[in-house]
């Protein structure tokens, strides 16, 4: 929150000189508002890259979970059919 310059004296106290600190803060905050175009572009790319990495990690975790939870059926429940040349489940 920035204070208007005409209201600086309203926030000043008699015990300490806050006017100087408020003026310094106003000067610093006004200089921070000037962000260059490459900085904005870099921030945008950073957000895109972080989103992509996050989605890849989520996909990887889901894929690992699917692989770990997919178990083959017991050999008792599988029968080999010679004419089709592959195993089929009976249950």
Curated annotation (Swiss-Prot):
Superkingdom of the source species: Eukaryota
Tissue and organ distribution: Expressed in the nervous system.
One Pfam match: MPS-4
InterPro entries recorded: MPS4
One MF term in the entry's GO annotations: potassium channel regulator activity
Residues forming coiled coils: none
One GO biological process term: regulation of potassium ion transport
Quaternary structure (record): Interacts with kvs-1 in the nerve cells.
Protein name (database record): MinK-related peptide, potassium channel accessory subunit protein 4
Native source organism of the sequence: Caenorhabditis elegans
């Amino acid at each position: 929150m920035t204070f208007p310059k005409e209201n600086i004296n309203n926030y000043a106290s008699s015990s300490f000189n806050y006017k100087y600190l408020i003026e310094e803060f106003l000067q610093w905050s006004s200089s921070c508002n000037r962000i260059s175009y490459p900085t904005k572009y870099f921030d945008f790319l950073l957000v895109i890259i972080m989103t992509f990495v996050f989605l890849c990690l989520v996909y990887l975790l889901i894929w690992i979970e699917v692989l770990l939870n997919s178990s083959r059926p017991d050999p008792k429940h599988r029968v080999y059919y010679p004419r089709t040349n592959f195993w089929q489940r009976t249950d």
